[in-house]
């Protein structure tokens, strides 16, 4: 009996080990594709690719995270506002699964806040207060969960940047938070080469007007 159990464990370990490089390679290739994608169609396609990886590795939060992330970006750049909610519904679904697999994860909580922020664009006048507050709470929670996460400061700073001063935002507050993000990026090291490591390019674009008197960069 002991020998059978030991053999089972050895076979299980060998199978897990054999799957790991395959999973890593699939993720790495999909992330490389994601970094190049710029259209809604491309982002939806790579989201589907991450979903296929997730279905093969159901206990891994990262493919669900990236499937949601790709759709959240697609939602932000979708010009047909009647389709935004449908795109973000998929992002929300995948983000919720990632959250269940990795509870209390700063990256996942931040992503859930981003999905809510994306819904505001459908009708800012009617949705701004509700989704803006919910999104802000999640982003602040993400920062509290991991104070060294530069993406949390980046997304909070972006939100402040585009929020009028009379509503608690403004360029000065946004730039101050973006500066904190810049400092966090200087020391940030992802857990691996397939863990979240995006944001520096966006930060550079957002910080361009800070302290220069330039106009606020265009937000898609």
Question: What are the language-model segments listed below?
Answer:
Residues 1-23:
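Bacterial Sec-dependent N-terminal signal peptides
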Residues 20-33, 56-78, 103-122, 148-163, ...:
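Amphipathic alpha-helical repeat scaffolds of TPR domains
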Residues 36-49, 83-93, 128-136, 175-182:
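Helix-turn-helix repeat elements of alpha-solenoid scaffolds
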Residues 53, 98, 141-142, 181:
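Canonical positions in the second alpha-helix
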Residues 85-138:
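Hydrophobic, well-structured mid-protein blocks that either form specific transmembrane helices
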Residues 127-165:
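A contiguous pocket-lining binding segment that forms or flanks enzyme active sites
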Residues 172-175, 180-220:
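Terminal, low-structured helical/coil segments at or just beyond the last alpha-helical repeat
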